[in-house]
Regions:
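Active-site microenvironment for binding and transforming phosphate-containing groups
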Residues: 1-196
């Protein structure tokens, strides 16, 4: 069963929003019933800003739309087919927001939820994307994207965890989709598509 953690919701983007990403489309079931794999339909779980989604359904896709300075951390355990995606907004903080709004508090929560769902962080393949400098002012003074990328990298290293692939920095936003069947992270930005 594919579920989103945190609020316990499963969300599907409007079909036009998904089509605009250019990612490999997944067939989504109508809103009035669950996706039916027999019909070629699969769950699409959306990690909004400050949110995470975790599933043990290998037919699911996990997506984070419009990463600018935000960073998405993908985790996939090939033994249990557990997949997770966290959408971090800031390196640290204490104000409200979703369960993974801040890297410093959100990364431990994400890793704990991933393991609670059946994944092993020692066996998992981790990938990270985002952390762009969207505006010249951000690149020169605030550096939120760079700081987000550094915070995730440092927090993972402090736990002895490494990335098998990264797509960080730059000056354009990204949309990412984690394929729960094989751990591939599809990345789409203006004028570019890649898989890591």
């Amino acid at each position: 069963m594919a579920t989103a953690s945190g609020a316990g919701r499963v969300s599907e983007p409007p079909s036009t929003a998904f089509a605009a990403t250019g990612l490999r489309p997944l067939a989504i079931g109508p809103a009035d019933r669950p996706a039916d794999p027999a019909r070629g339909e699969h769950a699409l779980l959306v990690a909004g800003i400050g949110d995470m989604v975790i599933t043990d359904d290998p037919a699911a896709g996990l997506v984070a739309y419009g990463l600018g300075s935000c960073v998405a951390l993908a985790a996939w355990d090939p033994a249990t087919m557990t997949a997770g995606l966290a959408h971090f907004m800031l390196p640290s903080g204490t104000s409200g927001g979703g369960p993974v709004k801040f890297v410093d508090r959100g990364l431990p929560a994400f890793l704990a939820a991933f393991e609670a769902r059946g994944g092993s962080i020692r066996r998992a393949c981790f990938k990270v994307a985002g952390g762009a400098a969207m505006l010249a002012i951000h690149a020169s003074s605030l550096g939120i994207g760079r700081r987000n990328a550094e915070a995730v990298t440092a927090a993972m290293a402090a736990r002895g965890l490494t990335f098998v692939a990264t797509d960080l920095g730059g000056t354009v936003g990204r949309t990412v989709q984690l394929d729960a069947s094989d751990g591939r992270l599809h990345i789409r930005s203006v004028g570019r598509a890649s898989v890591i």
